[in-house]
Swiss-Prot record:
Cofactor (UniProt): heme
UniProt keyword Oxidoreductase present: yes
Pfam families: p450
Family, as annotated: Belongs to the cytochrome P450 family.
Function statement: Not known, probably involved in the catabolism of octane and guaiacol. It displays a weak activity in the O-dealkylation of 7-ethoxycoumarin.
Entry's localization field: Cytoplasm
Record's protein name: Cytochrome P450 107B1
GO MF term set: heme binding; iron ion binding; monooxygenase activity; oxidoreductase activity, acting on paired donors, with incorporation or reduction of molecular oxygen
Group of enzyme by EC: oxidoreductase
Length: 405
């Protein structure tokens, strides 16, 4: 790369999604560098493990949706582009720092305690078994479409108190929103999502229940601190993050196991290794590849590189989790590996509030799938599988499998 050259992720396009780990390996050679994102925005990408952890903890690399949005809109205007993502979906706890982050997170964290999550186990097992019943006797199925997606969307919908009758629409909107390369389609999906959430909230006001959405509404009604805009953004975050990460985690885990027969055999011989298989998947094929945008509130130094004030910053979680300085033989899938410290769910105050739920869903899903179908195997060559084109997410478009008898 010549001096001053800005790597252009748009030029990589779909090839980047299909070859992400090799691209990240090359980027880690220059671990803090300026890049051009898929929508033409210049930003800084941080790829090494220690730098990523530093960035996730440094308050100078801020989550302030209003300020970040100003930077984005200014740069897009300078480039004669327009943003696709609706600002109505942005002011949630993932895009804010304290004190707003503290009060927003406080409203939902009690719904995701270890005790509350464990209480969901029987229902998650029931949903899982019902889905597996539908796979039995089939010669070939798409495991993403018929298992990895419907399980978490059903769980989060029930937790939130939301009917999942429009889940296909919701999935379509989410796919566009996490893509980022289609600003016009993203704008349309944003409008549709805001309209859907507004209707959803209005209906829940008249038909409250024993669910998380009602709890959030009552907090607003009781004079707590959620504005209408914050409520829409919070519900958006919980519904999207509450299923998207887990869809990818389940799919990536099954793919990694089927692609590494020795590890699959080890797990079948010793089911107590299942939690380790989930953690290794989180490291090896991190379902969230990059965090959402941050910005520098002041200049920040990483080694010899100084990121000036007012710059957009991305932390590459997936790249950090394949850093050989932190994980020995990082490109090997090993379910007995000590994975403590991976950053698949983030680090610091923005650590994923739903991590325990995602882990539980994945353990139940993968464990019961392998138990139910001992002859489960791939129905396509690994070279024929395609990764979704998303700068944020790492997940397959489809995962064809043959369940067996």
């Amino acid at each position: 790369m010549t001096t001053g050259e800005v790597p252009d992720l748009l030029a990589f396009d779909d090839a980047f999604a299909q070859d992400r780990h090799n691209r990240y390996a090359r980027m880690r050679e220059e671990p803090v560098q300026r890049i051009r994102t898929v929508n033409g925005l210049d930003a800084w990408l941080i790829t090494r493990y220690e730098d990523v952890k530093q960035a996730l903890l440094d308050p100078r690399i801020a989550k302030d949706f209003g300020r970040t949005q100003q930077i984005i809109e200014k740069r897009l205007a300078d480039a004669e582009r327009r943003p696709g993502f609706s600002p109505d979906l942005g002011p949630h706890m993932l895009n804010t720092d304290p004190p707003d982050h503290t009060r927003l997170r406080k409203l939902v964290v009690k719904a995701f305690t270890a005790r509350r999550v464990e209480g969901l186990r029987p229902r998650i097992e029931q949903i899982t078994d019902d889905l597996l019943d539908r796979l039995a006797g089939r010669s070939e199925v798409d495991l993403i479409d018929e298992f990895a997606f419907p399980l978490p969307i059903t769980v989060i919908s029930e937790l939130m108190g939301v009917e999942d009758s429009r889940r296909d629409d919701f999935r379509s909107w989410t796919n566009v929103l996490v893509d980022g390369s289609q600003p016009e389609a993203q704008a349309q999906a944003s409008v549709a999502m805001v309209e859907y959430l507004t209707e959803l909230i209005a209906k829940k006001r008249t038909e409250p229940g024993d669910d998380l959405l009602t709890a959030l509404l009552e907090a607003v009604e009781d004079g707590d601190r959620l504005s209408e805009g914050e409520l829409i953004a919070m519900v958006f975050l919980l519904l999207v993050a509450g299923h998207e990460t887990t869809v990818n985690l389940i799919g990536n885990c099954v793919l990694s196991l089927l692609g590494n027969p020795d590890q699959l055999a080890a797990l079948r011989n010793d089911p107590s290794l299942l939690p380790g298989a989930i953690e290794e998947t989180l490291r090896y094929e991190s379902p969230v590849a990059n965090g959402t945008f941050r910005h520098t509130a002041e200049a920040v130094r990483f080694g010899d590189v100084v990121i000036p004030e007012g710059e957009l910053v991305w932390v590459a979680l997936g790249a950090a989790n394949r850093d050989g300085e932190r994980f020995e033989d990082p490109d090997r899938f090993d379910i007995t590996r000590e994975t403590t410290g991976h950053v698949a769910f983030g680090h610091g105050i923005h650590f994923c509030v739903g991590a325990a739920l995602a882990r539980l869903e994945a353990q139940i899903a993968v464990g019961r799938l392998l138990e139910r179908f001992p002859d489960l195997r791939m129905a396509a060559s690994p070279d024929d599988l395609r990764w979704r084109f998303s700068v944020l997410m790492r997940g397959l478009e489809k995962l064809p499998v043959r369940p067996g008898a």
